Amino acid sequence: SNAVEGLLNYRFSKRIKEQKTKLRMVIDWFENQVVDKGWNAGFNKFYPDIPTIGCRGYIPSLQYLCSYPSKIEYNSGILPATISVIGKGFIDSTREFAAILNVENSPAFRFKHLWNESTAKPDSNYFTILVALSIISEESFNILNLVNEYLKTIDSNNMRFWVKPHPAMSEKELRNGFDNKWPEEFFIIQGLSSEYIPRSDIMISGMSSICLESMSLGVPVIVVENLRGLSYNPIPEEVPQDLWRPCRTPNDIENEVEYYQNRSDEEINRHKEIGLKIREDYFEPVTKEGVRNFLMLDLP
């Protein structure tokens, strides 16, 4: 269980201290779960003089409360000395329950591709909708069913639907799990999402970090909400709703697709500017200087 793993992490730091292992710094993939608490409690006790960093290298949902540390946790010594986030826009929200926390901006390693220069753009012969599915099967099939129902109400001759399954789901599992006959308009794509986002006009997805990625490239997102539980919205509250819309029904999808499909060139350019601001605020570029600062290495 996680509790046992947390204890093992604690004892790991104790054992390597007993072996007189010298450490310069400690970095933990930080979600502030039990395993992290054991890890940080151990290194704070047995290596009190070295820097400990909790690397929050992901986009936290507002409902993923464990990733927002409390002052009690800080006072209990179970947090890293520094929490690194992937963009300056995440700093204030990370301190929501403990203003005393040392939170620093660091390179967004997993999202380095967002800063790669690309000439890719949507095919003007189609209106391309990228349907990005979740790791949660139930959520993925709910998204597909809604899009399929929407598909029945429109003329889709000039529309193209790219269905991108989560890497944890095979194409066979996707087709077999879909209740209805697989629509011929649905094209399953493989490979990296980053290859398809710039070539899409809009994206339809669920509660996934790919939503903020898409918006940062100026590609609008229709976010399908969860009707059977909490909706883990991955979009920070500070992000304007210009580039995203929540939806629950096929009619919602129809309305929002129509809105984004009929944007003027001026509106599209304005949305790209908003996307650049999102990228600057929430995805710190990976640079040599940024990496050396993160690793506390002396700059040349």
Residue ranges and their predicted role:
Residues V35-D36, S61-Y64, F90-T94, H113-W115, ...:
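Short, charged/polar "capping" segments at the starts of alpha-helices
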Residues S1-K112, I210-C211:
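Active-site and donor-binding regions of nucleotide-sugar-utilizing enzymes
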Residues T52, I83, M203-I204, V221:
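Short, well-ordered beta-strand core segments
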Residues R24-M25, T128, R160, D201-I202:
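Structural motif
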Residues A168-L217:
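Donor nucleotide-activated moiety binding/catalytic core segment of transferases
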Residues D281-P300:
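C-terminal alpha-helical cap of glycosyltransferases
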Residues F97-N105, N180, S209-D281:
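Catalytic binding pocket for nucleotide-activated donors in carbohydrate/polymer assembly enzymes
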Residues E104-D179:
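Conserved catalytic-core segment of nucleotide-activated headgroup transferases in glycan assembly
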